Amino acid sequence: MHINNWPTHERPREKLLAHGAATLSDAELLAIFLGSGLRGHDAVQTARNLLHTHGPLRELLDRPPGDLMRLPGLGLARACKLTAALELSTRHLAAALQRGASIHDPISAGRYFAQRLRANPNEVFAVLFLDNRHRAISFEELFHGTINGAEVHPREVVRRALTLNAAAVIVGHNHPSGNREPSPADQMITQRLKNALDLIDVRLVDHFVIGDGAPVSFAEHGWL
C-alpha cells in the first residue's frame, strides 16, 4: 500500500508536523528523506530494509558518500544530499556552541559531543570549557585512547581550565562499541575529575557518554 493510502495519523510527514521529529522512528525519518521507495516498496519499507541490511543508523550514516551511493534506494543524488544534511546538522550545533555562545541547553551540548565524537573508532575524551556566564571558551579533545578506553588525567583538565580562566566545564567521551552505559571506570574518573576541579572552584556541569542513541548525561541521572 502506498503511503498516501495510509491513515493520515500514521504517515511520517503528518506525524512529524503534528508531534515533532523526535517522535518518529529511525525508519520513518529516513523515509521522509528518501521521499519514495524502490519498485514494489514504499519509502518506509525501503528505509527499514536499508537499516536492517546496512544499519544500525549510526553505521549507515557514518558511511562515506561513495559507499552510500551504492546502497539500494539511495544513489548518487540522495547520498550527496544525506551527507550534506549531516554536515549542516554538525555546523548548526557548532554554531550554537561557538566561542562566546551561552550554553543553557544541555541537550544541545550533548548532541554536539555526539556529533564530534561518535564516529571515532577509538575512545576520545573531550572537554568544553565555559566562562562564568556559561559562554563557550574552547572545545578540546584532550585524551585519545584505544577501542577499549582512554586514560584521563584530571590534572591536565585542571591545567587547561586555569590557562583558559574557565569557570565551568562539560566533559564527554565516546564508547566505540556503541554501548552508552557508563562503566565503573567512567564513574570513578568523573568523581576524580569533579574533586580536582572543586579545588580550583571550577564546576563540572555534566559528563556525556556517547554511544548508539541519545547521549547519557551524568547530571540528568544525578551522578554528579
UniProtKB/Swiss-Prot annotation:
Q: Which InterPro entries match?
A: MPN, RadC_JAB, RuvA_2-like, UPF0758, UPF0758_CS, UPF0758_N
Sorted alphabetically, which PANTHER family does this protein's record hold?
A: DNA REPAIR PROTEIN RADC (PTHR30471), UPF0758 PROTEIN YEES-RELATED (PTHR30471:SF3)
Give the signal peptide, or none: none
Which residues of the sequence carry a binding annotation for Zn(2+)? H173, H175, D186
Q: Where is the MPN domain?
A: 102-224
Annotated GO MF terms = metal ion binding; metallopeptidase activity
Key words, A-Z: Hydrolase, Metal-binding, Metalloprotease, Protease, Zinc
Family annotation (SUPFAM superfamilies): RuvA domain 2-like
NCBIfam families on file: PRK00024.1, radc
Spell out the protein name for this chain.
Answer: UPF0758 protein PD_0117
